Amino acid sequence: MRAVAIFIVTLLVLECVYFVMSEPDPGQPWQVKAGRPPCYSIPCRKHDECRVGSCSRCNNGLWGDRTCR
C-alpha cells in the first residue's frame, strides 16, 4: 500500500513540474507589437549619421553595435 501511495505522489509531483515548466500560450496579435523603429538597423560611426526618424545617436560605445538609436 505504501508503494502505491508513493507512486501516486510521484505522478502528482511530475505533473506539477510539467505544468510549471510548460510554455505559456502566445499572446493575441494586438499584444505583440513590440518592434524596433526602422532606423535601428542603420549602421553608423558618428552621431551625425543618425538624425533619421526617432533615432538621434549612434550606439558606438565600448559594447555598442554601431547602429543608430
From Swiss-Prot:
It is found in: Secreted. Expressed in the fat body, hemocytes and salivary glands of partially-fed female ticks. Not expressed in the midgut. GO terms for biological process: defense response to bacterium. Its main location: secreted. It comes from the Eukaryota. GO terms for cellular component: extracellular region. Keywords: Antibiotic, Antimicrobial, Secreted, Signal. Residues 1-23 form the signal peptide. This is Antimicrobial peptide ISAMP. It comes from Ixodes scapularis. Has antimicrobial activity against B.cereus (MIC=5.8 ug/ml), B.subtilis (MIC=12.3 ug/ml), S.aureus (MIC=10.4 ug/ml), E.coli Edl 933 (MIC=3.2 ug/ml) and E.coli MG/655 (MIC=4.2 ug/ml). Non-hemolytic.
